[in-house]
């Protein structure tokens, strides 16, 4: 999965801002299913065959998956590692390195059972059984890092050039998130608070695994095989302010049983749906433990089958009030999924998504996914969008219809923010669609090199504005969405930092957005000015083609640009990369703190003592609460 982790509405009184979701020298990882294999011999592919029975009303599911994994390395391995991302908790002490061997499950012939400790208002995934698919023999499995890493001990090592099939049965649940956490006011005040706070923030599993306002999002509900780097597994999940999901591509066949009044939209294409009240029908998925899964499915359920190739993850939304509309753009079907009451805004989102696919296809290269969906869902405050393969989720807080009757009774002060709100939605749609190129098709390690997807996706949104709306609108978007984020961050006392830090080194959403997604994006604008359009876009197209379905590194990006640069200009190109990523020239290159804005808000731009900081927060909170409490009437 790739996430656009943070997107915010901080506009009107001071700016229009949309925040998106590193180090060089990472080991090369070039063995998945991309260009390199096309030049030699295509190797067997990793594949998931998953079956889920969804109990929407109870917020639970029962599942089974059969994973086929082929060992492409030159060494045998006797252990498989999976990540249970739903069990990640958003605090520094919640995931440690102490492994725990769990007791034998007497009901599964010596297998082991792992259960995550139940936590109120958090999702969870519990593994109940692991078996060798070829022999049906139980496999010992263990829990590391507080239920976030599943370690499976194989009975025999998997030799280089051979594969194995493993069966995993699991159950899970998701929390109910209240509307007070997902509305426009929550998003705005959350970003105001982040701008002023000094405490550390981390992403939580509930951000992408929840039910709210009649919509359920399952972004990481199943055990995900850990990525391999340098011949070893990436074993530990590192909670941070950035994207926690780091995966290789795989093929997916997924069967979801759900109530027959439930609409389901996923990362993959739907093959068929059928009534499913009998175990014989459920058995069409070879991964399915029919007894386990059908126990959660009602006789009035429908089984939906989905298939997809070269997906980095599989996510889906479900709900009784979900609708969809589509538009063809070349070979890609662009789809908007939305809550029925948001149809008017969803049409605008679909138009922007279709234009973005058109622009990015022409500039970067063909999109291999047949469908790209833009999904309206009530994401929690601080998370404006979340991306998965072929599937981008945008916070419902952006779906504000200013022509609705309810808007007529609002003060002019509120209605005059229309352009800012609508621009924020369009920018977020373009950013979300861009992640299909940068983060999904071309993968990267979001913990070590977040600039490769977040910064590039944010710059791509600017490129979309230039081609869809012209230079005047693009210049305004650059100032509001890129320079403006950094300027406000510095005005509120934030420190200029290098953009090649690991995601966990950024303190909160606001800092991450200012340094990675905004400052990093402006580097690409500088490179384009320096190289010219022809060489710049040729470099991006080569980078995309060379790293398709693989895990790219910062050196891969640099190499693509150096390859299009004359020898006499390479030193200057190196300086540009270094200046924007490894050095701190933000005030000079972007914008310094704005003293007039600070004075008008009663904010001291200097790093404040704790007492002064609290006073500053109170001053701004009074303004923010008054202004944005009016905005809640829109919802």
List each model region and its residues.
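Beta/coil-rich, acidic/histidine-enriched accessory regions frequently appended to metallopeptidases
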Residues: 53, 57, 306, 546-635
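Bacterial N-terminal signal peptides
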Residues: 2-16
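N-terminal, polar/Ser/Thr-rich
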Residues: 16-62
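Amphipathic alpha-helical substructures
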Residues: 342, 366-368, 447, 472-473, ...
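Acidic/His/Gly-enriched intrinsically disordered linker/tail segments
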Residues: 423, 454-530, 580-588, 593-605
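Extended, low-hydrophobicity, Ser/Thr/Pro/Gly-biased non-transmembrane segments
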Residues: 107-129, 142, 166-317
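Ligand-binding face of N-terminal immunoglobulin V-set domains in extracellular IgSF glycoproteins
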Residues: 62-88, 93, 107
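Juxtacatalytic substrate-recognition/specificity segment
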Residues: 254, 305, 322-436, 440-449, ...
């Amino acid at each position: 999965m790739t996430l656009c982790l943070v997107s915010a509405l901080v506009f009107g009184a001071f700016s229009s801002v949309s925040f998106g979701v590193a180090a060089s020298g990472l080991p090369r990882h070039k063995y998945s299913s991309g260009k390199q294999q096309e030049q030699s011999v295509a190797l067997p592919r990793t594949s998931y065959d998953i079956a889920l029975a969804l109990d929407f009303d109870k917020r639970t599911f029962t599942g089974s998956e059969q994973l086929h994994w082929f060992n492409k390395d030159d060494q045998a391995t006797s252990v498989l590692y999976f990540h249970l991302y739903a069990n990640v908790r958003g605090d520094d002490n919640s995931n440690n390195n102490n492994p725990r061997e769990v007791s034998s499950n007497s009901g599964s012939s010596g297998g082991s059972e792992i259960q995550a400790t139940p936590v109120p208002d958090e999702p969870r995934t519990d593994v109940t059984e692991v078996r060798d698919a070829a022999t049906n023999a139980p496999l010992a499995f263990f829990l590391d890092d507080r239920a976030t890493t599943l370690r499976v001990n194989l009975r025999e090592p998997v030799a280089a050039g051979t594969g194995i099939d493993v069966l995993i049965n699991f159950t899970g649940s998701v929390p109910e998130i209240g509307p007070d956490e997902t509305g426009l006011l929550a998003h705005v005040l959350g970003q105001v608070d982040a701008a002023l706070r000094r405490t550390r923030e981390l992403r939580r599993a509930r951000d992408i695994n929840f039910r709210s306002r009649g919509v359920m999002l399952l972004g990481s509900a199943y055990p995900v095989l850990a990525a391999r780097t340098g011949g070893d597994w990436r074993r530990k999940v590192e909670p941070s302010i950035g994207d926690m999901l780091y995966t290789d591509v795989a093929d997916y066949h997924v069967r979801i049983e759900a109530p027959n009044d439930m609409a389901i939209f996923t990362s993959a294409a739907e093959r068929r749906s059928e009534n499913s009240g009998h175990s014989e029908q459920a058995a069409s998925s070879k991964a399915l433990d029919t007894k386990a899964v059908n126990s959660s499915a009602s006789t009035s359920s429908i089984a939906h089958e989905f298939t997809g190739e070269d997906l980095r993850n599989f996510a889906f939304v479900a709900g009784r009030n979900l609708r969809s509309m589509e538009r063809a753009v070349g070979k890609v079907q662009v789809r908007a999924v939305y809550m029925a009451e948001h149809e008017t805004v969803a049409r605008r989102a679909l138009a922007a998504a279709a234009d973005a696919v058109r622009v990015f296809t022409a500039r970067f290269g063909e999109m291999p996914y047949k469908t790209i969906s833009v999904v309206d869902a009530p994401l929690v405050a601080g998370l404006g969008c979340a991306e998965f393969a072929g599937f981008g989720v945008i916070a419902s807080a952006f779906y504000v219809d200013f022509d609705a009757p309810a808007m007529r009774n609002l003060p002019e002060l509120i209605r005059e923010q229309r352009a800012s709100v609508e621009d924020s939605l369009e920018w977020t749609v373009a950013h979300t669609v861009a992640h299909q190129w940068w983060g999904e098709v071309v993968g990267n390690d979001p913990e070590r090199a977040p600039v490769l997807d977040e910064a590039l996706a944010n710059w791509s949104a600017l490129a979309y504005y230039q081609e869809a709306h012209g230079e005047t609108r693009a210049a305004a978007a650059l100032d509001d969405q890129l320079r403006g984020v950094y300027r406000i961050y510095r005005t509120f006392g934030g420190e200029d930092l290098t953009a090649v830090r690991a995601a966990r080194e950024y303190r909160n959403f606001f800092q991450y957005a200012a340094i990675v997604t905004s400052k990093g994006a402006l580097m690409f604008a500088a490179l384009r000015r320096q190289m010219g359009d022809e060489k710049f876009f040729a470099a991006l197209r080569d980078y995309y083609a060379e790293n398709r379905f693989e895990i790219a590194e910062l050196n891969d990006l640099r190499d693509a640009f150096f390859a299009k640069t004359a020898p006499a200009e390479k030193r200057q190109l190196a300086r540009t990369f270094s200046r924007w990523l490894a050095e701190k020239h933000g005030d000079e290159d972007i914008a310094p703190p704005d003293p007039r804005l600070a004075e008008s808000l009663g904010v001291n731009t200097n790093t404040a003592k704790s007492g002064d900081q609290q006073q500053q927060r109170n001053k701004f909170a009074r303004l923010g609460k008054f202004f944005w409490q009016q905005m809640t009437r829109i919802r």
